[in-house]
């Protein structure tokens, strides 16, 4: 019997909340995490790959961080790009922390002013990199995604352009977990207006939405029993 371990932020961890609320018995699913950092530390999706047999697609823009992601998640599809509303290149601001050095996951194409001021107050410095940008439909095609159970979007203030690109016509996830910390719950709901997502809940700095056209399957009694027997 494998002992479950969660990797996400906060208490309860984000991945535990996702697992217990939306995917308590699903095995062999597909996850997409944008802003995946090194693929393990504070990851909302690694649990599903490690313990539930999912395939993970990870997107990370930071040049210093992406090689760590490749080493940590060799079984995943790892994409070195920044999700946005246009394809091409853009300036990515990588953050260097006085405590953690370059291993810090607050980089962004567009920090919100309050977040940027907070990072400066903490003594952080910044290095600009020219990085590849990719739209949501291009990402789905490039990663070969034909099924998507979970999309976790946490790109430090650049969520609005990424959500805009989700309107361009591509496969949408059954469950969307998006960081609302820089905007608030209600503003995030406005950003997602017109897309087929129903607000489900909010926890810590994340909002959770269910795709009304393709919701996650509700596990039956037999599936729940089998999952308890397996114990992993």
Task: Name every feature range the model reports, one short phrase each.
Residues 1-232:
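Phosphate/nucleotide-binding beta-alpha loop and adjacent structural elements of enzyme active sites
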């Amino acid at each position: 019997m494998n002992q479950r371990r969660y990797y996400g932020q906060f208490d309860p961890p984000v991945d535990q909340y996702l697992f217990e609320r939306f995917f308590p018995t699903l095995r062999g699913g597909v996850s997409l995490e944008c802003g995946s950092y090194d693929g393990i530390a504070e990851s909302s999706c690694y649990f599903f790959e490690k313990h539930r047999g999912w395939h993970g697609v990870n997107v990370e823009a930071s040049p210093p961080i992406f090689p760590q992601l490749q080493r940590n998640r060799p079984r995943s599809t790892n994409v070195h790009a920044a999700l946005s509303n246009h394809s091409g290149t853009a300036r990515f601001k990588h953050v260097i922390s006085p405590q953690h050095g370059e291993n810090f996951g607050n980089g962004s194409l567009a920090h919100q002013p309050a977040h940027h001021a907070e990072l400066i107050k903490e003594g952080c410095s910044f290095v600009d990199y020219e990085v590849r940008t990719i739209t949501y439909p291009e990402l789905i095609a490039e990663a070969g995604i034909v099924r998507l159970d979970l999309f976790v979007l946490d790109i430090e203030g650049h969520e609005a352009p990424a959500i805009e690109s989700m309107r361009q016509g591509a496969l949408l996830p059954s469950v969307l977990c998006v960081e609302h910390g820089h905007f608030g719950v209600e503003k995030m709901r406005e950003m997602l207006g017109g897309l087929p997502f129903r607000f489900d809940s909010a926890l810590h700095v994340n909002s959770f939405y269910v795709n009304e056209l393709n919701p996650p399957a509700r596990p039956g009694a037999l599936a729940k029993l089998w999952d308890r027997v397996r114990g992993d």
